[in-house]
Amino acid sequence: MRRQVRSGTVRAMEGEDGYFGERIAATYDDPSSELVEPGVVDVLAELAGGGRALELGIGTGRIALPLAQRGVPVHGIDLSRAMVARLRAKPGGDAIGVTVGDFATTTVHGTFTLAYLVVNTIMNLTTQEEQVACFGNIAAHLEPGGCFLIEVMVPDLRRLPPGQNVVPFHVSQQRAGFDVYDVATQAMSSHHITFVDGRGEHLSIPFRYVWPAELDLMAQLAGLRLRDRWGGWGREPFTSQSRQHVSIWEKPTG
């Protein structure tokens, strides 16, 4: 990339709001931000089946609000007070219950027919132990017959050049982005560089990528069983070429 910029690196630091503080919350709903795919709310409303839904990483309510408008009672868990404040400021946001905390371990009152984690949010838990704990926590909150849905990418390690660990995912005049992988630990960090008036600002956020079969084992350890796995929200088949999956595990009734 032939662009000269003045130094302006800012690394996201863990604090009260984790890596998703006011700086990210302020632009999370910008028109250029990743949008919710069509069909998401339809699928979630169907799975809720008239019961309560629990959203992990509820954020600014981009999914919870339209789901609540469909008549589904939604409760959310989120570590970021800055994100929750944005939710509260939206029409209808004050009617959605939110518990502030780490969704791997935070408990809430009551049980749910549906719990869900979308847009790669399971990867915000940066250790395998935390991801396993999340499944156990959700299983304890589900009613018998209730479902746990996760939407997450399939790790695209085929794009890694031999001997390298960096994969670019966006390049434009305004911003650039790349992921750095550690295939030994499944740790990755997502780097975002924004160019404003010739100045570059750098943001880095850690994640842990996870394989479908690994998620199935986590579910099994929590007493859940796989019900469906699709290649996307259109319920297309999941294949070796799929770049994401929507997986649903069910809590047995017996």
Which residues fall in each region the model found?
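Conserved class I S-adenosyl-L-methionine
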Residues: R3-G49, G51-G59
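A conserved beta-strand element that flanks and buttresses the S-adenosyl-L-methionine
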Residues: Y116-V118
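SAM-dependent methyltransferase
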Residues: L149-M218
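C-terminal lobe and adjacent flexible extensions of AdoMet/dcAdoMet transferase-like proteins
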Residues: P212-G254
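A short glycine-rich, Lys/Arg-flanked "PGG" loop and its adjoining helix->strand segment in the class I
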Residues: V132-P144
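A short acidic, Gly/Pro-enriched loop at the edge of an enzyme's catalytic core
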Residues: T107-L114
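Class I SAM-dependent methyltransferase SAM/SAH-binding core
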Residues: T60-T105
